C-alpha cells in the first residue's frame, strides 16, 4: 500500500543503507 522503506544515511544504524553507502560493522553497525 505504497509504504516507503526509509534508507539509512551516513552514520546511521544499518537497516537499508542509502546508495552508495554500505554497512560497516565496528562496535555498532553504521552506514558509511
Curated annotation (Swiss-Prot):
Tissues showing expression: Expressed by the venom duct.
Disulfide bonds: 7-18, 14-23, 17-31
Primary location group: secreted
UniProt entry tagged with the keyword Disulfide bond: yes
Subcellular location: Secreted
Modification sites for 4-hydroxyproline: 6, 13, 20, 29
Keywords: Disulfide bond, Hydroxylation, Knottin, Neurotoxin, Secreted, Toxin
Gene Ontology MF annotations: toxin activity
GO cellular component: extracellular region
UniProt function note: Intraperitoneal injection into fish (0.5 nmol) provokes vertical suspension and paralysis after 6 minutes.
Domain characteristics, as noted in the entry: The presence of a 'disulfide through disulfide knot' structurally defines this protein as a knottin.
Name recorded for this polypeptide: Conotoxin pr6b
Originating species: Conus parius (Cone snail)
